[in-house]
Amino acid sequence: MTEVTELMRPEGEALNTKEVLLNLGPQHPSTHGVLRLVLQLDGEYVERIDPHIGYLHRGTEKLAESFTYTQIFPLTDRLDYLCPPSNNLAFALAVEKLLGIEAPIRAQYIRVMMAELARISGHLLITGALPMDLGAMTALLYAMREREMIMDLLEMITGARMHTSYCRVGGVREDLPDGFLPKIREFCEIFPNRIRDYERLIENNRVFLSRTQGIGVISAADAVDLGLSGPNLRASGVDWDIRRDEPYEIYDRLDFDVITREEGDCYARWLCRVDEMRESIRLIEQCMEQMPEGPFQVDIPTIAFPVDKERVHCSMEALIQHFDLSAYGFDVPAGEVYSVIEAPKGELGFYIISDGSPKPFRMKVRAPSFVNLQALFGVTNARYLADMIAVLGSLDPVMAEVDK
């Protein structure tokens, strides 16, 4: 047996070290999905990161070439499955741009309200999950309590809790149900105080602060060079938000602040998302105040399903309209378009090439999580194994959106 004294080295003499390869994932709670990182370690120091993605690849972009434009909406639900209304909206806007149409004003307000609910839902999860990754579990339990309220609201309006498929080309699937606005007003009254509860849980937690402040710093220049977007970009001091700078739908009618931080570290990214939830509440409240009466989808029989579903049972014209759109879809003029929105994770874009048929010739998704994930490999001051968990959580990738 080797004596303990034999393992000791004279002062100043270097120890012999051995590089170790460590698999982080693909089944690991802190990777937030099926991400595999092969880490080359020297002790606890990470010398190299080799990412392995694709475990959740379903061929979404190729599948879209075999689907009509209406049938593609369920595929978009499964990109960032935490925030499907935002995915639906981005795709609908791209197709509407090709068609040269706009959704009715009431439908635009409903879409924006749903997109902001989705933003809160997505931010809530990482608001609680990042502290949990670092050992503080209570915040996640609080966050899931409020997220359950949002799931109930989504179920009330769409009939589904996750894969909502609520948007349609030219509007939304159905109008707001009776009793929905009082429910969402109740949520808007409760939620700001709940956000303050999250901050009280975390802002004096010395362990969480030491694990996130000054860790994973991304400068403004690096954030731009890496192509980051969303809270990950704004936390580095870049004042850019598509909702304000390239407004779509009715965002130019709404008043809100773009949240930025200067530190660019893990804590700044967490704070950005917390503050953005407050702004989303402001936007939802303005939507409820300004929303006019009127149609919830365009009145174009060749594009939109019959508004009155009862007519399908007693009108031959409505039945034919419903059957044709369900079975064959609608032709979209030949051309190409790129449409982008400010999704919860960042800039979500759809590039579509149409050949004039009811199905896209090519569809490309610009997924923000795919771009944001690359920042993990560009961070220079977070090279310890424990820091990888904090940085990855603060970037908030969704692997379904990365792998598509």
Curated annotation (Swiss-Prot):
<keyword id="KW-0874">Quinone</keyword>
<dbReference type="InterPro" id="IPR001135">
    <property type="entry name" value="NADH_Q_OxRdtase_suD"/>
</dbReference>
<keyword id="KW-0997">Cell inner membrane</keyword>
<dbReference type="Pfam" id="PF00346">
    <property type="entry name" value="Complex1_49kDa"/>
</dbReference>
<keyword id="KW-0614">Plasmid</keyword>
<dbReference type="GO" id="GO:0048038">
    <property type="term" value="F:quinone binding"/>
</dbReference>
<keyword id="KW-1003">Cell membrane</keyword>
<comment type="function">
    <text>NDH-1 shuttles electrons from NADH, via FMN and iron-sulfur (Fe-S) centers, to quinones in the respiratory chain. The immediate electron acceptor for the enzyme in this species is believed to be ubiquinone. Couples the redox reaction to proton translocation (for every two electrons transferred, four hydrogen ions are translocated across the cytoplasmic membrane), and thus conserves the redox energy in a proton gradient.</text>
</comment>
<comment type="subunit">
    <text>NDH-1 is composed of 14 different subunits. Subunits NuoB, C, D, E, F, and G constitute the peripheral sector of the complex.</text>
</comment>
<keyword id="KW-1278">Translocase</keyword>
<dbReference type="GO" id="GO:0005886">
    <property type="term" value="C:plasma membrane"/>
</dbReference>
<dbReference type="GO" id="GO:0050136">
    <property type="term" value="F:NADH:ubiquinone reductase (non-electrogenic) activity"/>
</dbReference>
<comment type="similarity">
    <text>Belongs to the complex I 49 kDa subunit family.</text>
</comment>
<dbReference type="GO" id="GO:0051287">
    <property type="term" value="F:NAD binding"/>
</dbReference>
<keyword id="KW-0830">Ubiquinone</keyword>
<protein>
    <recommendedName>
        <fullName>NADH-quinone oxidoreductase subunit D 2</fullName>
        <ecNumber>7.1.1.-</ecNumber>
    </recommendedName>
</protein>
<keyword id="KW-0813">Transport</keyword>
<keyword id="KW-0472">Membrane</keyword>
<dbReference type="InterPro" id="IPR029014">
    <property type="entry name" value="NiFe-Hase_large"/>
</dbReference>
<keyword id="KW-0520">NAD</keyword>
<dbReference type="InterPro" id="IPR022885">
    <property type="entry name" value="NDH1_su_D/H"/>
</dbReference>
